[in-house]
Structures are given as structure tokens and as C-alpha cells.
Amino acid sequence: MRSPGRPSVTSPPLRGEIVAAFGRHFLVKTADESTLTCVLRGKKSGAACGDWVEIYQTASEQGVIERILPRSALLYRSDLSREKLIAANATQVIIVVAPVPSFSEELINRCLVAAESQQLSVLIVLNKTDLLGPSKVALNGLSLYRELDYTLLPISARNDVKPLLPYLEDNLSVLVGQSGMGKSTIINALVPDAERATGDISPTLDAGRHTTTHARLYHLDRNARIIDSPGIQQFGLQHLSIEAIAWGFREFRPYIGKCKFNNCRHSGEPGCALANAMRESEVSVRRIDLYHKLIASLNTNRIPSSSSRTKIQ
């Protein structure tokens, strides 16, 4: 797709929602249900699936994004070199795990911290419960998150996805998880023509064989929408401060600000309220260890100030 020319100043802008994102190409659905393949104007900051945008139409099925409208939330991950936008304006993060292949608990906690930083609700879905023995082991391992008041939903998407439906109502949910956890099975059960719709986008966005690596938004009904995001193996949190990461562990919050030293990182400093809570078994040793892994992975030279807890544009 060639870069579009500047439209006539007399043509009115259209408002639409990004329903598919692949690199610098976006599929935007407008109010009349038509879709335009769009690119961002100039060097504007990145857009994400779920963004509401103002666009100018430049051809029958093409347009240019002139403005990204204010967001209520932005879920994204970051490493030392770049940021990867996942979804905009979501209200719920659905973390999909399965007993086979094995899932990463560190990745679950990274997703939880990212969701908490944007004040998004969280649902943890244990898929493939038809694998009875492995599922029992996985459920035992995930019971900690139920104790932390996260909702844990066991399902077998290949057999019955209906238990998930009530959690989707009145939400824009985004599915996240490692490859192989069954996210595609869930989407195909919820949206029977999802594979065809995804195939249609391939030539439109010139995505070729990488089609499965883009985010896609589906309307299930007028009150339920869901974004399928690419499978991830890492979830960098370089954009969050140490304070924000600690806040992302919800059970830590009663102890934050009660340490002997204001700059306590909860990593063995004397008078640490969180360490005392762990010794009193009020906080899980497992979660403390996971927190230490997260902050150890940060490059402290790139950590923003404690006031930079979100990135809403």
C-alpha cells in the first residue's frame, strides 16, 4: 500500500475504530460498517487495535489516520529498545494458560502487573481442562491467584466455550498468553468465521504468511467485543517504575509506604514492611520471589519516575 497523499481540506474526517493492526497498516471500521485500510500520517505515535481514530479517506478503500482519539487505557509491553502496543481502550485482560504446553508463571505475573497499571479487570482462563491429570496440577498451581481475588475460569474451548460468555458481556476484552495455550481455539469457538475474516485481511494489509501475528478485534454482539493478540513469550515492563511494579502486586499495597526507608525496594532492606509481612505469612513467598525477578530484569537507567504509571495518549 502506497503512502496516501494529503486529502482535500474540504473532505470531512471520518471517525472509526481500529479492528486490525499489522505494523504501520491498520484496518479501520467506520460508523457505516465499511472498512478502510489506513496508515498513520507522518511520524505520529503508534496506534493499536481498539483505538478510536479520525481518518481521511484517500481512495475507495484506503485512508490515512490523522488523529488518535483519547484512550481510556493502553495495554503494551516494552523492552530496552522498543514498545509493542497490544490493545487500546480494553476493559478486561483475559490471560489464557493451559496445562500443556506448560505455562510461565512469571509471564502471568507480568501480564497481571501490566493490567493493574492500567486499572483493567483480569480473568485467568485455564484452557484444555479435558486433559484431566495435567489440569488438576495446573489448577493447584493457580489456586494462589484465586486467593488474591483474581477470577480463575477452567474451560475446554474445544468442547464448550459457553462458560466464558458471561465474562465477556459489557467488556472489550483482550486475550493474551503464550503460543499454544488455545487462544485461537477460543476465538474460533466464539467467532465461527474468524479464520475467514483473518484470511481476508492478509491481502488487504499485505501481511502474507505473517497474518497470524497481528491483533484483531471481533464484535460478538453489541455489548461484547474481544481482541485476539499474537502469542507472546516475553512481556517486558521497562516502561514501569519499581513503585508501579510493586503496586501491580495487589496484596503488597497495604504495606507500601510503611517501610523504614522511603526508597525501599523490598529487596532485603532493613525495616521493610513487605518482608515483615512475608515472615508473618501475610504475603506469599512465591509472589515475593516473582516480584524480585521482575525488578531484577529492569534496566534502572530507563525506569521512569514513580508518577509515570500509565501511558494514555
Swiss-Prot record:
Gene3D superfamilies: Nucleic acid-binding proteins, P-loop containing nucleotide triphosphate hydrolases, Probable gtpase engc, domain 3. One of its GO terms (biological process) is ribosomal small subunit biogenesis. HAMAP family: GTPase_RsgA (MF_01820). The lineage of its organism: Bacteria, Pseudomonadati, Pseudomonadota, Betaproteobacteria, Nitrosomonadales. It comes from Nitrosospira multiformis (strain ATCC 25196 / NCIMB 11849 / C 71). This is Small ribosomal subunit biogenesis GTPase RsgA. Zn(2+) binds at C259, C264, H266, C272. Residues 82-235 form the CP-type G domain. Monomer. Associates with 30S ribosomal subunit, binds 16S rRNA. Binds 1 zinc ion per subunit. The gene is rsgA. One of several proteins that assist in the late maturation steps of the functional core of the 30S ribosomal subunit. Helps release RbfA from mature subunits. May play a role in the assembly of ribosomal proteins into the subunit. Circularly permuted GTPase that catalyzes slow GTP hydrolysis, GTPase activity is stimulated by the 30S ribosomal subunit. It comes from the Bacteria. PROSITE patterns: ENGC_GTPASE, G_CP.
